[in-house]
Amino acid sequence: MSDAASPAGSPAAEPTEHRDEDQVNETHQDDGSNHGGNDEDNDGGNDKDSDVLSEIDENEFGDDYGSRPVDIDENVAMKLKARRKTTTETTKKPKEGRRPKKRSRGDDDVDAADDDGERRPRKVRAEGERRARKEVEEQQAQQEENLTPDERRRRALERAIDAAVKNPTKRRRKKDDIDLEEETDEQIANLKVAMEKACVADNEAREQKQPAVHKLKLLPQVTAILNRTAIQDSVLDPEINFLQSVRYFLEPLNDGSLPAYNIQRAIMSALMKLPINKDVLLSSGIGKVVVYYNKSKSPSADIKRDAERLLGEWSRLILKRTDDYKKRHIEMREIDVGAVKLGQREGGSSQVTLTQRPAGKSRYEIERERALAPEVRNNNRARPVGLPASYTIAPKSTYIPGQAPTDHRPIGHSGHEAFRRMTQKGKGKR
């Protein structure tokens, strides 16, 4: 079929030049996409393609092929690989340049101008001062080397006296030009006055048969002061003597009744956390109240336990005893081996005198005391042995390394010898 015989409107009927122009415009609109194929396929103006298209019957494509299911082989589908995106399909993100590094504060900070008029960083200035100080110290050391021993000793003594006499500068905490320590002392002084007034008011209320609630109202402020670790020095200062007012809170009222349980519980718990020393105990007198709570039957069991624990800790401060087992001092005495053997031979009566025998006595003195002792009647009775429950004196070790003992037989070896002789006699009779 020729081009002239093709139906109107078919691709073959259009002029070749117009078709080429339309295809060029479509390629420009697609922005360089690859859907069009190569140049030979896009041409489409040759006679062979037009002849093939003109011979196809359009009625054969009347059925809808899109709705029919398509069979896909799974083995083939699994072998397919995902296509990677080409560089032309994705737009590249513009590359950013390097960001400037942040400079440290020490490099930026500079002090005032130096003698030469230049502004230098603070680190450089500190290094210069350190170097100058080191040079001065080296010069002083060289000067001391040239001095006599007496002059060196005199200078060392002067430096030691200056260091001992010089008082350390005590920095006082300030906030907004307000001295916090003075404010704390004033607050404690005002609270002391309020606590004493509350104690007097509770005693007057009990005399009038009314409930004593003034201490309970003031209790939160008292516990807040006692539990603040930052002002413990002010609380324990003997000059301020805040614990004396705390003692008034714990003391019984005039009618003999104890304060409320909440007061006892809160103050006892706070006292166990405070590092109280001997001077504070003497100035405040709070130990007397703790002793009363320990011996009285009125407080509850937990309050008595706390009072007993406080009494034990404070007694160590007064008696200068430590609760460290390593620092414990144990009295030691030398043991008299001859007296121990003599007591074992004489039987059970020596057990009573073993604990009563003082150190340093000879065997003759021990036997003389036993002979002069009054007679014990009713010997046929069985009496418990009077041994102490615990020992307070430890024997002193007489072992000398590298030296052979004079008496190698241990204590109680004579009984083994008697038993051995008895067994030998029995064998001889057989």
Curated annotation (Swiss-Prot):
Taxonomic superkingdom: Eukaryota
Extent of Low complexity compositional bias: 1-14
Claim: Transcription is one of the keywords in the record: yes
Gene3D superfamilies: Conserved domain common to transcription factors TFIIS, elongin A, CRSP70 (1.20.930.10)
Bias-annotated ranges (Basic residues): 95-104
Pfam families reported for this sequence: Med26
Any one cellular-component term (Gene Ontology): nucleus
Localization: Nucleus
Ranges where the record places region Disordered: 1-153, 402-430
Composition-biased stretches (Basic and acidic residues): 15-33, 124-137, 406-420
Span of domain TFIIS N-terminal: 244-321
Regions of compositional bias (Acidic residues) in chain numbering: 52-63
Keyword Nucleus among UniProt keywords: yes
Alphabetized UniProt keyword annotations: Nucleus, Transcription, Transcription regulation
Any one biological process term the GO annotation gives: poly(A)+ mRNA export from nucleus
PANTHER family: PROTEIN IWS1 HOMOLOG
Family: Belongs to the IWS1 family.
Primary role: Transcription factor involved in RNA polymerase II transcription regulation. May function in both SPT15/TBP post-recruitment and recruitment steps of transcription.
Descriptive protein name: Transcription factor iws-1
Organism: Neurospora crassa (strain ATCC 24698 / 74-OR23-1A / CBS 708.71 / DSM 1257 / FGSC 987)
